[in-house]
Amino acid sequence: MSDPHLKEKVVVIAGPTASGKSDLAIKIAQMIDSEIISEDAFQIYRGLDIGTAKPSKDDLAKVKHHFIDIKEVDESYSAYEFARDARIVINQISSKKKIPLIVGGSGFFLQTLLGDRRISDKDNPIVPKKAGIENRLYNALLIGLNTERSQLYDRINQRVERMFEKGIVKEAENLFRQQGNFQSKKAIGYREFAGYFANQYDLSEVETLIKRDSRRYAKRQLTYFKNQFPDMRWFDTKQITENPKLIIDLVKKFNQF
């Protein structure tokens, strides 16, 4: 096992959808003068803004974000490609004497980036000889956000309702106007529109389906993170919203160590 103190440091903010990851990450990044690496499988796509809950223009102006709007909707982007590209960005951020903040809900992307999971590609030059936490490529502080299940589901439902208020229907129309079975069309918040555009059900049903699929996804995310990242430190979203200093102090201590 290699000494973690000799490795580049990264801070990870993870958790289920609608748990408040992005807001917390921006606060931390501003406090420690850092940059954010988005490890979201769908925020990479231009034009998929509302359904993927991308940071606002104001938030993007406050803190530099990476891996937002880097692909067209008809392009694919694998976990391997993300890990390859993100490791270059981590090196660049670290060279500025900053700690990269990795933020998102894709456990598979995160495992691949950190080196916890081996990708089945014999020619893959970035996979460590041994995979697993003990052979992780970075000295990582993993922070998980969660809250009581009913409160999380309420947050999800409210987010979906805001999506419709902001114009998610137009984004979905633009996406499905393009022919092809793209990876981007599999994103929750968009894939549920397929039946609507096929005249199989109305918009109220689309909203119901997005809420249902988002809740199910959040449950799977929690299971995945808790099973695959035993060293993740968990905090309640409500507690952190009221007192973000708890996390900020933890990150500052990690930065100094």
Swiss-Prot record:
Gene3D superfamilies: P-loop containing nucleotide triphosphate hydrolases. It catalyses: adenosine(37) in tRNA + dimethylallyl diphosphate = N(6)-dimethylallyladenosine(37) in tRNA + diphosphate. The record marks 106 as: Interaction with substrate tRNA. Substrate binds at residues 17-22. It comes from the Bacteria. Its cofactor is Mg(2+). Keywords: ATP-binding, Magnesium, Nucleotide-binding, Transferase, tRNA processing. The keyword Transport does not apply. GO terms for biological process: tRNA modification. ATP binds at residues 15-22. InterPro entries: Dimethylallyltransferase, IPT, P-loop_NTPase. The keyword ATP-binding applies. GO terms for molecular function: ATP binding; tRNA dimethylallyltransferase activity. Pfam families: IPPT. Its EC number is 2.5.1.75. Monomer. Catalyzes the transfer of a dimethylallyl group onto the adenine at position 37 in tRNAs that read codons beginning with uridine, leading to the formation of N6-(dimethylallyl)adenosine (i(6)A). Belongs to the IPP transferase family. This is tRNA dimethylallyltransferase. The lineage of its organism: Bacteria, Bacillati, Bacillota, Bacilli, Lactobacillales.
